[in-house]
UniProtKB/Swiss-Prot annotation:
It is an enzyme of class 7 (translocase). It is found in: Cell inner membrane. One of its GO terms (cellular component) is plasma membrane. The lineage of its organism: Bacteria, Pseudomonadati, Pseudomonadota, Gammaproteobacteria, Pseudomonadales. Residues 295-360 form the Mop domain. Keywords: ATP-binding, Cell inner membrane, Cell membrane, Membrane, Molybdenum, Nucleotide-binding, Translocase, Transport. Disulfide bonds: none annotated. This is Molybdenum import ATP-binding protein ModC. Pfam families: ABC_tran (PF00005), TOBE (PF03459).
Length: 360
């Protein structure tokens, strides 16, 4: 299963030129600054804009092929589209809004039913309300449920959290994670938030000025030093681990790194043993030492190997890429510290991780 998107679309001051081969499963994030082409790409896939030259194929369905002069209109494309703000019918109840999406699909073709959509998004208690009596986060969950009830082969989400405050975002993120875990519907997710991408996406496409700078698994791509992602204050890595222990006395969760016996400890509520989850480590929260120090308040000290380095976003710092038993790690340190430690590729030393963010 795969998604092929080849687009060339020119405006007076902007050109979109993409050739992407994307996974046909999971969540793919289109990530980049404002004006990079994220939403234009999504609109072309939806058929809301027509690329002058291009081909769009979702698994075995071709929606556009300019060489064959084929263009499937938007209403005939099996997709769901979630905008920044949910466009709900104000005069209809939540249930009637959802039924509007459901009625578009013949019963024999429905892959998501009303009960499943309302349970996944936690909206069963809202069915008799009207949109004007809902919070922003609730309206967005209704919009997502309505898109799912069209039983799409592809779900497009255009910055669905952008219009929400931080509290509403934190409320809706767990529901988006459930969609990822429980539905076999590929998602293209537009965002300029690296935290959202790190938490939700499996694959990332980094866009800039209408072109793809990189495309690959989230963990690998965020750790690349040759991309602009590495230069900002948000530079860091996303690692997948499994819960191996919980200490109820100190309320510490122990996470085992993939393919090794190394562990990370983090203050967190208890989670089921064996549960897979992601965590993020910012480069600014990693320091380096030539030897381990047990007499330290820093819980997480790991043996690492230096891979390479690049200048950081200011002249005083460098960004060092490290290997931790096969998993990447970044450290942002001063050039003075680099020289004091005589850092070089292949060198073995200790990383001291001052903070870990569990993405769940």
């Amino acid at each position: 299963m795969s998604i092929h998107v080849k687009l060339h679309l020119g405006y007076q001051d902007f050109a979109l030129d993409l050739d992407l081969q994307l996974p046909g499963r999971g969540v793919t994030a289109l990530y980049g600054h404002s004006g990079s082409g994220k939403t234009t790409c999504l609109r072309c896939i939806a058929g809301l804009e027509k690329a002058g030259r291009g081909r769009i194929q979702i698994n075995d369905e071709v929606w556009q092929d300019s060489q064959r002069k084929l263009f499937v209109p938007p209403h005939k494309r099996s997709l769901g589209y979630v905008f920044q703000e949910a466009s709900l019918f104000a005069h209809l109840s939540v249930q009637a809004n959802l039924e509007f999406g459901l009625r578009r699909i013949a019963k024999a073709q429905r892959r998501v039913d009303m009960a499943q959509a309302t349970e996944l998004l936690g909206i069963g208690h809202l069915l008799q309300r009207h949109p004007q009596h809902l919070s922003g986060g609730e309206r967005q969950r209704i919009g997502i449920a309505r898109a799912l009830l069209t039983s799409p082969r592809l779900l497009l989400m255009d910055e669905p959290l952008a219009a929400l405050d931080s509290k509403r975002k934190s409320e809706i993120l767990p529901y988006l994670e459930r969609l990822h875990d429980e539905l076999d519907i590929p998602v293209l997710y537009v965002s300029h938030s690296q935290d959202e991408v790190a938490r939700l996406a499996d694959h990332i496409v980094l866009l800039s000025d209408g072109r793809a700078l990189a495309s690959g698994p989230v963990g690998e791509t965020l750790a690349r030093l040759d991309l602009p992602l590495a230069l900002g204050d948000d530079a860091g890595v996303v690692v997948e681990g499994r819960v191996s222990h919980y200490d109820p006395d100190y309320q510490l969760l122990t996470l085992q790194l993939p393919g090794s016996q190394l562990t990370i400890r983090v203050a967190h509520e208890p989670l089921a043993l064996g549960k897979a989850l992601r965590f993020k480590v910012q480069a600014r929260d990693v320091s380096l030492s030539l030897q381990d120090s047990e007499h330290s308040s820093i819980l997480n000290r790991l043996p690492v190997t230096v891979r390479d380095e690049i200048p950081a976003d200011n002249a005083a710092h460098v960004l060092v890429r490290l290997d931790v038993a096969g998993s990447p790690l970044l450290a942002r340190i001063t050039r003075f510290s680099r020289d004091q430690l005589s850092l070089h590729p292949g060198q073995q030393l200790w990383a001291q991780i001052k903070a870990v963010a569990v993405l769940a």
